[in-house]
Amino acid sequence: LLLSSFKPILVMKQNLKTAHYRNGDLIPQVSDNAAWNSLSTGAWCWYKNDSATYAASYGKLYNWYAVNDPRGLAPAGWHVPADTEWSTLISFLGGDPAAGGKMKEAGYVHWVSPNTEATNSSRFTGLPGHFRPFHGQFYGDFGTIGYWWSTTFDGSEGAYCIQLVYNL
């Protein structure tokens, strides 16, 4: 729970791990890169399709279609933030890049060194869960970056997101 001088800003305690929209409809798991690339509907996966390694600590990775689906990805009473809501949170925490350190889990259990300025003073406990781009291929070193969707379309091929990085 974060409190501003204007209104409370509430964030969920853990990442989403649902396989259903709010109305109960199934969100399919898609592991194949080519299938992920050709999607025009919602889907989810585990990072590198490895639930044994990543399921306990990290949430599922969802594509833009799942995030933006009118059936709702988040539980009742919750929603995926719009870009303006992320901006409000970041401003409240001191702007970019100061907010990043306040939002990242401190230490090196999940993040690689140097995990710059990580204090988790916001109690957001951002983890480096990576993401899966539209083309479906996973890349980069795990432990270095985490992404969180916004519901704000960027005008081209996706949506705005925020990212937390190990060295910023």
Language model features with spans:
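Conserved positions within compact, well-structured domain cores
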Residues: 1-168
